[in-house]
């Protein structure tokens, strides 16, 4: 069983913000590679259970706020007895240009508070994360940049890598 967690903040106000790119990627996956899924609301999360090929996969959107995502991730890992090697976290990254991505097998939080909380709750940095570039606008505060809804043009720009990222995620799912 694989666990793919998209980081974001719950609620309409945050739906199309750069900080919610993890949620957007989960939605993209659910709409493109998943044909049959079951949704469960548990552990302050939306958990979408789906078969991808011969693998059972949990696609998760924690409904805690970003900075408390680790609590939900830990509970789900424990309940479903998923090992850390089968966890992939999707997050935004201001240090990568829009449309770029980086797969890391382990490492620090890079200043990302959602990743920091997961590391703190799991007490390890040894889990995979796929960082999706959102760039940074130094003319406004980081909080405003990440939490202000984006227009359609910007959304297309940051989502241009989603098909390639989807293939990386499919490879992760199929890796036994």
Swiss-Prot record:
TRNA binds at residues 14, 65, 67, 113. It is an enzyme of class 3 (hydrolase). GO terms for molecular function: peptidyl-tRNA hydrolase activity; tRNA binding. It comes from the Bacteria. It is found in: Cytoplasm. The active site is at residue 19. Keywords: Cytoplasm, Hydrolase, RNA-binding, tRNA-binding. GO terms for biological process: protein quality control for misfolded or incompletely synthesized proteins; rescue of stalled ribosome. Its EC number is 3.1.1.29. The record marks 9 as: Discriminates between blocked and unblocked aminoacyl-tRNA. InterPro entries: Pept_tRNA_hydro (IPR001328), Pept_tRNA_hydro_CS (IPR018171), Pept_tRNA_hydro_sf (IPR036416). Belongs to the PTH family. Hydrolyzes ribosome-free peptidyl-tRNAs (with 1 or more amino acids incorporated), which drop off the ribosome during protein synthesis, or as a result of ribosome stalling. This is Peptidyl-tRNA hydrolase. It comes from Phytoplasma mali (strain AT).
């Amino acid at each position: 069983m694989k666990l793919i967690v998209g980081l974001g903040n719950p609620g309409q106000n945050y739906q199309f913000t750069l900080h919610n790119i993890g949620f957007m990627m989960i939605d993209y996956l659910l709409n493109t590679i998943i044909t049959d899924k079951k949704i469960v609301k548990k552990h302050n999360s939306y958990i979408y259970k789906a078969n991808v090929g011969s693998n059972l996969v949990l696609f998760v959107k924690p409904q805690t706020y970003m900075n408390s995502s680790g609590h939900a991730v830990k509970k789900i890992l424990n309940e479903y007895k998923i090992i850390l090697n089968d966890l992939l976290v999707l997050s935004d990254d201001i240090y990568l240009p829009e449309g770029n991505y980086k797969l890391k097998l382990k490492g620090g939080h890079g200043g990302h508070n959602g990743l920091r909380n997961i590391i703190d709750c799991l007490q390890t940095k040894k889990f995979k994360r796929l960082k999706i570039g959102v760039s940074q606008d130094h003319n406004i505060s980081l909080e405003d940049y990440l939490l202000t809804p984006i227009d359609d043009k910007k959304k297309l720009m940051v989502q241009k890598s989603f098909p390639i990222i989807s293939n990386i995620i499919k490879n992760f799912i199929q890796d036994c």
